[in-house]
Swiss-Prot record:
Required for disulfide bond formation in some periplasmic proteins. Acts by oxidizing the DsbA protein. Signal peptide: none annotated. This is Disulfide bond formation protein B. The gene is dsbB. One of its GO terms (cellular component) is plasma membrane. It is a multi-pass membrane protein.
Length: 162
């Protein structure tokens, strides 16, 4: 792994951890109630952080290893972009016409053996069609911007690494 690619992955790891902490702070400090799609995006942020950590621990030595790392990091980020885009579409619908976004994660994972440990991460009962704003911008837009930045950064670093 070239120094540039490694630095970029370290940066993505740090930003991902901060984004995950920010999502928890928005819920537990600011009192925002996340919906099912918000929690799905939070899990994609956590998966992105875990993927960057795995790539950093594996230390691929060849360009093909860097390619694997870029693809591995991009998978949860692209998933997060698609979830954010779906939530933005739901929020663009006229009030009362948006479909339900599904059962809460706490209901879905209740029988899971690690539920008690993981429950604070997936707790939330907000409405997916009701937008919450941060600095005047809807939260799914911030989420999509973060995921897009992850994808662009990892592929830029891979392309520049020679």
């Amino acid at each position: 792994m070239t120094p540039l690619f490694r630095k970029a992955v370290w940066l993505l790891f740090a930003v991902s951890v901060c984004a995950f902490a920010g999502s928890l702070a928005a819920q537990y400090v600011l009192g925002m109630e996340p919906c099912v799609l918000c929690i799905s995006q939070r899990l994609c942020v956590l998966a992105t952080a875990l993927c960057t950590a795995i790539v950093l621990m594996c230390r691929p030595r060849r360009r093909a290893g860097g390619l694997f790392g870029a693809v591995f990091i991009s998978i949860p980020a692209v998933t997060g972009i698609s979830v954010a885009a779906y939530q933005l579409w739901l929020q663009s619908l006229p009030p009362g016409t948006a479909p339900s976004c599904g059962a809460p994660w706490t209901f879905r994972l209740k029988g899971w053996s690690l539920f008690d440990w993981f429950e604070p991460v997936v707790r939330g009962f907000g409405n997916c069609a009701e937008p919450d704003y941060l600095l005047g911008v809807a939260l799914p837009v911030w989420s999509a911007a973060y995921f897009l930045a992850v994808v662009l950064t990892v592929w830029w670093a891979w392309a520049r690494a020679k």
